[in-house]
């Protein structure tokens, strides 16, 4: 009788453990479905988000910033900048390098395309922010 009671207790623990494992797997799978695939993050269509930011100063004590952006743009759009924030812009703006047409500067700043068309500068008073486009 004693051996039988131990087996019943052990089998109950095994069943309980199995049920908990199945529940955990189901919860993990459902939360992964809400987030997207493992390691991926879904972005609302037509928007961008910053995924990494880098800051440093060069030897002339000029602060240099760069950022990595992930976008989910509609057809005919590509990653760009509007009001100093990452955004989806018309592809023609980037293809033709009409940088100031995407309104990259903040309100009150003047936009000028760099002489070599590699980017733009936003200026206000004696403050100038230069952006060079890299791919």
From Swiss-Prot:
Q: What induces it?
A: Up-regulated in LPS-stimulated monocytes and macrophages, especially in polarized M1.
Listed GO CC annotations: extracellular space; glutamatergic synapse; synaptic vesicle membrane
UniProt keyword annotation of Signal present: yes
Q: What is its main location?
A: secreted
Keyword Magnesium among UniProt keywords: no
Pfam families registered for this protein in UniProt = TAFA (PF12020)
Q: Which InterPro entries match?
A: Chemokine-like_TAFA, TAFA_chemokine-like
Q: Which residues form the signal peptide?
A: 1-31
* Localisation per UniProt entry: Secreted
What are its GO biological-process terms?
macrophage chemotaxis; phagocytosis; regulation of membrane potential; regulation of sensory perception of pain; regulation of signaling receptor activity; superoxide anion generation
Regarding tissue, the record states: Expressed in a descrete subset of dorsal root ganglia neurons called C-low-threshold mechanoreceptors (at protein level). Expressed in LPS-stimulated monocytes and macrophages, especially in polarized M1.
The effect of disrupting this gene, in the record's words, is:
Mutant mice exhibit enhanced mechanical and chemical hypersensitivity following inflammation and nerve injury.
Q: Which UniProt keywords apply?
A: Secreted, Signal
GO MF annotation, one: receptor ligand activity
Highest taxon in the source lineage: Eukaryota
Which cysteine pairs make disulfide bonds? Answer: none
Q: Which PANTHER family match?
A: CHEMOKINE-LIKE PROTEIN TAFA FAMILY MEMBER (PTHR31770), CHEMOKINE-LIKE PROTEIN TAFA-4 (PTHR31770:SF7)
Q: What does this protein do?
A: Modulates injury-induced and chemical pain hypersensitivity. Ligand of FPR1, can chemoattract macrophages, promote phagocytosis and increase ROS release.
The UniProt entry's sequence similarity note says: Belongs to the TAFA family.
Q: What is the protein's given name?
A: Chemokine-like protein TAFA-4
The gene is Tafa4
């Amino acid at each position: 009788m004693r051996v039988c009671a131990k087996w019943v207790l052990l089998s109950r623990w095994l069943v309980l453990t199995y049920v908990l494992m199945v529940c955990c797997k189901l919860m993990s799978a459902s939360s992964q479905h809400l987030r997207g695939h493992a390691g991926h993050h879904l972005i609302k269509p037509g928007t961008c988000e910053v995924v990494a930011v880098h800051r440093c100063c060069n030897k002339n004590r000029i602060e240099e910033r760069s950022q990595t952006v992930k976008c989910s743009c509609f057809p005919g759009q590509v990653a760009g900048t509007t009001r100093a924030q990452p955004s989806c812009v018309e592809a023609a703006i980037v293809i033709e390098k009409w940088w100031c047409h995407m309104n990259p500067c903040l309100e009150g700043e003047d936009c000028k395309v760099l002489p070599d068309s590699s980017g733009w500068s936003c200026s206000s008073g004696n403050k100038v922010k230069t952006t060079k486009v890299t791919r």
